[in-house]
Amino acid sequence: MAYKYDRDLEFLKQLESSDLLDLFEVLVFGKDGEKRHNEKLTSSIEYKRHGDDYAKYAERIAEELQYYGSNSFASFIKGEGVLYKEILCDVCDKLKVNYNKKTETTLIEQNMLSKILERSLEEMDDEEVKEMCDELSIKNTDNLNRQALSAATLTLFKMGGFKSYQLAVIVANAVAKTILGRGLSLAGNQVLTRTLSFLTGPVGWIITGVWTAIDIAGPAYRVTIPACIVVATLRLKTQQANGDKKSLQIESI
């Protein structure tokens, strides 16, 4: 099965190997740290040639994701990969995320991450929500009730920028710990993940509950769900980096 051109995955080719590590590991390894039985990436010519220099074969990594997506669709019989947006929508269905198939992929990804964050906030007590808002530097929260604080956090996430990326990394890391048994390399930066302790528990509980239901549906979801979350987070990181570059260019004029 060859890579099917996918505009939503083309940005992966711009990333460094360190960025692609998490996606590679999601596609290749399971929770026990063992290779997935149906993974094809480590037997590929590209992997044998370049090893952990993932940036050299980002397209092959994208192809692997399309392959796992095809396990959830009838097109697998045809030997064709499935485009990322189709995989993402399928994942959103499993996670009971509201979305419009006709909207941009980035908005669907935002809805997916927002849903996980929203469910996490529902599981927190008032003090945890307040403390998280303080960590995220949300101002004037002293007189706000829990509902207003949760709404402020979700609004902050949807506004984009560094705080949105920070929240996305926290969510993605918690999901990875629950589903894969380990965190993401993206979450290694303490500046990004100071609020991690407030979300790990609730997110872990939610995903564990969801996982119990969807695990029966097929092993492909053990890959496509965390893979979509990682891709969404990597896209936010790219947007954040591009935004910083534009700011520097404007300042230098």
UniProtKB/Swiss-Prot annotation:
It comes from the Bacteria. InterPro entries: DUF3944, Ubiq_cyt_c_chap. Pfam families: DUF3944, Ubiq_cyt_C_chap. Belongs to the UPF0174 family. This is UPF0174 protein HP_1588.
